[in-house]
Every structure is written in C-alpha cells, then in structure tokens.
Amino acid sequence: MKKSNDCLKSKLLLYAHYYSPDVASTGQILQDLAEGMKDVFDITVICTVPSYSGIVADKYKQKKYYYENINDVNVVRIRVPEFTKSNKLSRIKNIISYFFGAINVTKKLGKFDYVYTISQPPILGGLLGVTGKRITKGKLIYNIQDFNPEQVM
C-alpha cells in the first residue's frame, strides 16, 4: 500500500496577524511563503479575521473562530475588535485579542514540527512564537522584519 505524501509532510504553524484577503504587506508575504511551501509542509495559519482597515465584516462577527482552507493552506481566523488607526488603545485591544485568541487556538491544534512567527506586532510576535513553540513542542522560526530599536522609546 502506497503512503500519501501528506503523511510524510512536516507540520508548520504560521502566526500572521494579517493574511489574505487583507492587503497588509506582511499578510501577502506570508501567503506567498505558505503557498510556496505547501508541497513540503502541512501548513496551518493562525490570523485575525480580515480587518486591516480596522473594520470587521458582518460575516466575521458571529463566532470566535473561523476555519478556512485557502489554496491548500489551513487558516484559522480569530475574531478581533474593530479599531481606529489613530486610536492607540483600540489598536492595543485588537493586538491583545489576537495574541490570546492565537494561544487558545494553538492549544486546540496539537503538535507541530515547526512554529513560524514574525516580528509584527512588535514584541508580541516573538512572545507568541515562544509560547506556541512550548505548546506545540515544535522548533521556532522567528522572522524579524523592520527592526527599529528606536520604536521601543
């Protein structure tokens, strides 16, 4: 009996605050990355519901989590509060909601061989990756983008 290729694939968990169809550059880059690796890895992306503009569509306001498959990539979307780009408190609430929602989803998904995260949002991206690594027992891949130490001040 011949084994399916999917049985041989390593599992990769990818954290992305934004993912397709959001137009944020990080979401587009991570979509290209995920779709480019889907033949080698069984990929699951944990991201927010489409909300780059700050507005959440009505179809994403009913449930806490949404499960989709986009071009053979498993996507788990987390409902987050709407925000205004000029209101820092609303942005912080959005980021914190994603962070804790992503941790809860990660606990439900089980083990992964690799956990991939980026430095967006700053600090929490790395913290989410380390937490995800501990939960899934996977190896952490941390992609640092746009590193600007002066942002801390």
Task: Show which residues each predicted segment covers.
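N-terminal subdomain of nucleotide-sugar transferases
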Residues: M1-N71
